Amino acid sequence: MKYIIEAFDKETEQLAYEIALPDGCDTQLAAIMGWIASQRGDEGYNLTSEQVAAIEVLANRTIHEHDHILQLTCNID
């Protein structure tokens, strides 16, 4: 599964940028997101500040959320 953070401008709701998360992070993301079932590859989730903070650690980078709506998408490789 490929996971991507999509950042949308809060005013225009246009896609501002994307961040691909590291391969093999399924187990860590499941814990962060509270998933019980495996993902199908067509899901999208709005992210809370707590989830963003945990994903920043996982991705080893800062995600600027103050002026963006952040969503996590699950995509089949």
Where are these regions (language model features)?
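Short, flexible N-terminal segments of the mature chain
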Residues: 15-40
